[in-house]
Amino acid sequence: MENRWNDQLAKDFENDPRRLRVYTSRLLGQEPQLVLHGGGNTSVKINANDFFGKSVETLFVKGSGWDLATIEEAGFAPLRIDVLNKLAQLETLSDSDMVEQQRQAMLDSRAPNASVEAILHAIIPFHYVDHTHANAILAMTNTENGLERVQELFGNRVIVIPYVMPGFALAKLVYEQTKDASWEDYEGMVLMNHGIFTFSDNAKESYERMILLVTEAEDYLDRAKALKPALGQGACDPLELARLRKNISDLRGVPVVAKLDSSPEAIGFANLENAGEIGTRGPLTPDHSIFAKRVPVYLSENTGDSIDTYASEYNSYFGRNTSNGLTCLDSTPRWGIWPGRGLISFGLNPKNAAVVGDIASHTTRVIQNSESLGGWVPLKESDVFEVEYWELEQAKLKTGKSAPSLQGSIALIALSDAFMANQCKERLTKAGAAVIAIDESSVQDKIGSAVEMTVLAHGGLDILITDVALDSSIGVLAGSLPAALPYLKLGVNSRIVAVGACSSSALNQCHQKIVTFLADSGEAQIGVVVTNSDNSVTFISADKSTRESKIIEKITAA
């Protein structure tokens, strides 16, 4: 594990604990082997003035929704430590009450909600506290003899806490087990199946303890020859990828983006004989279930059957673990293990799919580490369910914001007019679509490769935007339609949009040609929109007129 500390840079913050906290937090966030996409949390304890100018012992802890790699001072929530210490002494505390009490303990109401680990940070008696979900630590703890391995490696240098639900339950357990402990005797604290804490009154020491302990864990794995992942080769037919993405979208009820990881490491894992068994035992850490569900789908040659089986098993999982009042989430997988192709992740947009993809990549790597140590043993499903369906996440279901109109849709823009191509791309992206654009004059020569590039990048094709045809051979459309049609057939609410600066009669002629072409191809269900560049004249397939007119306004309005 690389030590990224820079004395010269840190010197600029030596007299400002909050800025120093930002600096060291970003150091941790820059290392994906420590944290991923909002994971982990950090804090600093200092005296701050309240509204009346009174000095108050304050915990500045990472706020919900912030990423350690890019966090700013505004991303830390300031809370009164005396209130947090009182909360730690309670026998019980619901998640909603914990959030409410933490909000009331804030010195700044504009700050984000504090991390659910705020109480735990408060009771650790050091100025700086760092918490990560280090892969090497998880590889050791998620094994049959994880506790013995941690004790063998670290001895009495770390406190070891058995797994318990994150939030108040964890803070309470740590409080009870350590209230008589001499914290100065320890360099860190390992949470089984969860992660690791380090702490110090010195920011550099706390950070370097994290790097040191994780490096020792990596060296332990190296000595056990547990670091080398399987490698493999394979290939994916774009049509089968589009078909898989269509099946997932249909089951989820909304279009999704599919991101295929066909790296040698991803294919190597997918090709393991026991990948379907070890890969579906459980998540790397329980919080990953919020983004990626408890397990992935293992895809057989009949991917549709695999998805149906996954959905049935997910509903059974919910039924086994649910209690009154819970709302079942959709039963669609968030990622999959695909022999011969690699790992595939699904999301409502490219960023969401990439986050899940990163989780999948790190999970499969750690699974192999743990298997080399004697066997991958993640948390039992009831513990994972408790996190996936915990109170705070269920509350979000009831207050979710409306999605962008084209969220999850995938578009290819193949226009010879660069300005119009950029205009369309900007509007489609703003509406939530994943967009690939080619704006060279030679779009006809590039359309075939552009279609495949779009499918391999995002999983399919729903919208083709191309030039209006002005001659009897339907011009550029003669090249673009045959290349795109097999994928549009597998799209979600597929449509073809032709744009051009020409007369109403020319637009109408082009519209009729496209409709006829689709009908002759047996694909009359694909929507057609033909419009001039200022959207003053538009021809739309009658059965989709209302929806398509709104869409075309979004993507062509000048």
Q: What name fits each language-model region?
A:
Residues 417:
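Conserved glycine-rich cofactor-binding loop
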Residues 432-435, 460, 492-497, 518-556:
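Conserved Rossmann-fold SDR core element
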Residues 420:
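Hydrophobic/small residue at the entry helix of a nucleotide-binding pocket
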Residues 434, 450-476, 489-494:
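A glycine-rich helix->loop->beta "capping" turn
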